[in-house]
Regions:
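Alpha/beta enzyme core
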Residues: 1-72, 86-97, 102, 108, ...
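Extended, intrinsically disordered, low-complexity segments
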Residues: 115-152
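Hydrophobic alpha-helical scaffolding
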Residues: 82, 100, 104, 125-132
């Protein structure tokens, strides 16, 4: 415990291509894991997966509440946040999620803009302007969704 934050993960956050969505984090196991490891945040499996979904996932909001309570209000992390409907993200945050990973959506925001950006220059600072703006705009929307704009 050298003052370094450590995020643990309990349960398996699979990939959407594997359709692995059933190994949810057990509340009692989460409580024990946190006590034994001293992690500063815990990534939990509550219905998400990495990648793009074929249909929107349904988060187990009650499980989030239960894990949050059992772990002494430890910050909880949601992996696989890309593609989760905004209302479910809001509910997850209200239940105890404190960090959400949106990596797939960030990649697609960037790549989608690269695909439509006119290639009239080889100057990277010009070519990358719109893809970078797409990422910025996406991040701003998620910062607002999570309520983080009220604490910045």
């Amino acid at each position: 415990y050298a003052g370094v934050p450590v995020e643990g993960e309990l349960g398996h956050v699979g990939a959407t291509k594997d359709e692995v969505l059933g190994n949810y984090t057990d509340v009692a196991e989460a409580e024990r894991f946190v006590k034994e490891t001293g992690v500063s945040a815990l990534a939990v499996m509550v219905g998400t997966a990495h990648g793009r979904y074929k249909k929107a996932p349904v988060l187990d909001i009650q499980r989030i509440r239960d894990i949050r309570e059992a772990t002494g209000k430890l910050p909880l992390v949601l992996h696989g946040g890309s593609g989760v409907p905004d209302e479910q993200i809001r509910m997850a945050v209200e239940a105890g999620i404190r960090k959400v990973n949106f990596a797939t959506d960030l990649c697609y925001a960037f790549l989608d803009q690269v695909m439509v950006t006119e290639r009239t220059t080889v100057a990277l600072d010009v070519f990358m302007r719109e893809p970078i703006h797409a990422i910025r705009d996406y991040c701003i929307s998620k910062i607002r969704l999570l309520g983080a704009d009220r604490i910045l």
